[in-house]
Amino acid sequence: MADSEARLFDATGKNIGSYKLEVMDTFWKRFMGLMGRPEMPIGDAALFRNCSSIHMFFIKIPLDVIWYGPATPDGHAPILAVSRDVKPWQLSFGPKHTQGCLEVAAGTVPISLDSIEILTASSDRLKATVIPPDYRDVVRDRIQVTRCSDTAAHLGGAAALVHGRAL
C-alpha cells in the first residue's frame, strides 16, 4: 500500500519521525513478514494487526517493535510497550492485551515517543498514545484510553479516560 504512513510524536505534539508503511494484511504477508530481507531501510515500517507476538526467524536485521492495545471506535489505542533492538532468531511478545505492532529498524524509535498516528491507503486511521504503567490495567477492561491534555502534566504526558472522566 503505497500511500500508507506512520508518524511518531513527542508529548508536545512535535513530529519526531515518519515511516513509509507496509501493512501486513494478508495471510501470506503476515507469514512472510520481513523474512529474508537484507535490510530494513530507515524510514520504512511494517504494521501487523491482530498480532501479540513476533518471531525473528530468518530475519537478518534487528528491529524496534511498538506494541499497541485495543482501539476504541474513534481509532484511539494505547501504546503498551516498545521492544528495542529485537535480534534475529528471537521471539518477542507484546504485553497482555496487545492488538498489534509496528516494526521499524532498530534504534529508530526515539526515547521521547509519546504517540503514533497510522494512516493506511484504505483510509483506516489509528492513533496510539503512551499511557503510564500505573494506568495500564484500564486497558484490561477495554475502556477508552486516550490522551487527556488537562491531566497530562502530572501523568507524564498521557492519561486514561473512563467514560469521559479523567482518572
Where are these regions (language model features)?
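Compact, glycine-rich, soluble single-domain proteins
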Residues: 1-167
